[in-house]
């Protein structure tokens, strides 16, 4: 009568096989894969918070020794509608590559915008880029975004719901978008303004 091997003996024999992966290592690998899946899902949730809008796509050329080299330039506005917005420019041989580079460039140049409880801006602000001048001022609830072109796109993706904007000077989309970014970057809350000036809020309003 032969003795049948127990489960522990069978498992130990499997572990002793050359090239076999131990049970503990298999469990650790399984746990690592689960953690990676959780991390990927969190990254997808973070990416889903961001929105991107293409303001302009142009076909541009560069004169080189062998002739003209054609490429595409994309102006992209990136924002999470929660007070963060950025403007990026991307160039590539195809449209998809140019947009992808524009999104990456926009996320590198983000600006934090202080929003009021009415989803407006705290104070009036001006911005300039090149020959473009942009004036933005707060508005009452229910006003909406009174702006046009690339300025409207920047304000909407920043999360501003009630604002008045005026474009002065150049009409180019890139300069106007950058001028709006300059105006938003200069915004300060009343508390931060009083702190920078070294006065109280009562003195600021008086």
Curated annotation (Swiss-Prot):
Transmembrane segments: none annotated. Residues 1-50 are annotated as: Disordered. Residues 1-15 have a biased composition (Polar residues). GO terms for cellular component: small ribosomal subunit. Residues 50-113 form the S5 DRBM domain. Residues 38-50 have a biased composition (Basic and acidic residues). It holds the Pfam family Ribosomal_S5_C. The keyword Isomerase does not apply. The keyword Methyltransferase does not apply. Coiled coil: none annotated. GO terms for molecular function: rRNA binding; structural constituent of ribosome. Keywords: Ribonucleoprotein, Ribosomal protein, RNA-binding, rRNA-binding. HAMAP family: Ribosomal_uS5_B. Belongs to the universal ribosomal protein uS5 family. This is Small ribosomal subunit protein uS5. It comes from Prochlorococcus marinus (strain MIT 9215).
